[in-house]
């Protein structure tokens, strides 16, 4: 089991969340509570959290989730992590779709619990705001290493274990290539 080196990453709180987004989620909670209390029989009004999401392609949104400082700390922590835990491809996926990853539930339960906290308290309200569906049962939280030196490209796929996927680039602008391409829509870098 990997022990986190940076104490801040072990704190279950919202310090790492982009503050305007966090405030928008908090302001959205009464609206979401009314909507869910009425069992979704009435329309959910546009929440402040939904207003923070920018629709880039139909049904595909960008949200300013984490603070830059958190992303920097995570990248540093991943540097320590790979000294003890190598990135491994998922053997249950076919070769074209295998990206080296570290599954947090298996290797860093403490960090997994903190990401679970973020899913429940921040991401889930955003998903309810955008899609009027809850997404509390997360299938996996992993750190993927999209490295052009080791893998020139991935292949089209659907995440079999999820109806909704959340991709969080930690080092935006700190690499060449990369990004996430959405079939018949375009590439997000």
Description of each model-found segment:
Residues 19-21, 29, 93-98, 119-126, ...:
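Short low-complexity stretches enriched in small and charged residues
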Residues 19-20, 47-48, 55, 64-65, ...:
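FAD-dinucleotide binding site
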Residues 37-133:
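Non-heme Fe(II)/2-oxoglutarate
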Residues 5, 102, 106, 136, ...:
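Alpha-helical interaction segments
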Residues 1-58:
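Fe(II)/2-oxoglutarate
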Residues 124-189:
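Catalytic core of non-heme Fe(II) oxygenases with the double-stranded beta-helix
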Residues 17, 24, 57-58, 62, ...:
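Short, functionally important structural connectors and interaction interfaces within domains
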């Amino acid at each position: 089991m990997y022990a986190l080196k940076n104490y801040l990453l072990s704190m279950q709180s919202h310090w790492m969340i982009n503050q305007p987004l966090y405030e928008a989620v908090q302001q959205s909670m009464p609206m979401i509570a009314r909507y869910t209390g009425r069992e979704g029989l009435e329309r959910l009004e546009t929440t402040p959290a939904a207003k923070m999401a920018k629709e880039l392609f139909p049904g595909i949104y960008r949200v300013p989730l984490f603070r830059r400082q958190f992303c920097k700390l995570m990248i540093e922590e991943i540097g320590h992590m790979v000294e003890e835990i190598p990135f491994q491809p998922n053997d249950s996926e076919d070769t074209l779709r295998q990206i080296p990853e570290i599954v947090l539930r298996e290797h860093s339960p403490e960090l997994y619990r903190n990401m679970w906290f973020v899913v429940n308290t921040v991401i889930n309200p955003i998903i309810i705001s955008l899609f009027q569906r809850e997404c509390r049962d997360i299938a996996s939280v992993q750190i993927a290493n999209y490295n052009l030196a080791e893998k020139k490209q991935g292949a089209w796929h659907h995440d079999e274990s999820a109806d909704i996927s959340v991709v969080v680039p930690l080092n935006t602008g700190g690499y060449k290539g990369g990004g996430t391409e959405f079939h018949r829509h375009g590439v997000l870098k």
